[in-house]
């Protein structure tokens, strides 16, 4: 057993209750494409677990069509904005220890005042992005 930095090496939770340490996270879109290829056999049941530190608001919206995403704030505060597919919107500010769920098909982004760290548990298959 070894200790691993989740910010550097995310975890894939897969079919059959597997947990796979992922290669070094680069933040590039190619990393996510390679991740999808590595775990294609898990389909919509796979989950990517990551932790990110933010010092600025997001410059994109994202949407996960294949499943829910859990956003767990572990430090600081972040304001999560959601645009649901029925046209409604929601906003919630999370502080350390609080979480929210982005339902499948919900566009979401976040604002950060200062800095914040969050853990994401994401059904990433088919994830889309658009400019903010």
Each model region followed by its residue ranges:
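Short, conserved beta-strand element in jelly-roll/cupin
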Residues: 65-80, 84
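Short, charged/polar surface micro-motifs in flexible loops or helix N-caps
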Residues: 44-45, 54-58, 75-79, 125-128
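Short histidine-centered beta-strand/loop micro-motifs
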Residues: 38, 58-65, 82-83, 91-92, ...
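A short, N-terminal "cap"/entry segment at the start of jelly-roll beta-barrel domains
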Residues: 1-61
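Short, surface-exposed beta-edge/turn micro-motifs
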Residues: 46, 67-70, 115-116
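Short acidic-glycine-tyrosine-enriched beta hairpin
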Residues: 84-104
């Amino acid at each position: 057993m070894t200790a691993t930095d989740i910010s550097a090496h995310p975890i894939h939770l897969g079919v059959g209750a597997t947990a796979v340490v992922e290669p070094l996270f680069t933040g590039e879109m190619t990393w996510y494409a390679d991740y999808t290829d590595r775990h294609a056999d898990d389909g919509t049941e796979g989950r990517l677990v990551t932790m990110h530190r933010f010092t600025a608001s997001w410059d994109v919206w994202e949407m996960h069509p294949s499943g829910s995403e859990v956003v767990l704030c572990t430090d600081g505060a972040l304001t999560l904005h959601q645009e649901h597919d029925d046209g409604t919107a929601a906003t919630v500010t999370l502080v350390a220890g609080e979480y929210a769920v982005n339902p499948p098909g919900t566009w979401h982004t976040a604002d950060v005042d200062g800095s914040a760290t969050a853990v994401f548990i994401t059904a990433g298959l088919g994830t889309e992005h658009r400019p903010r």
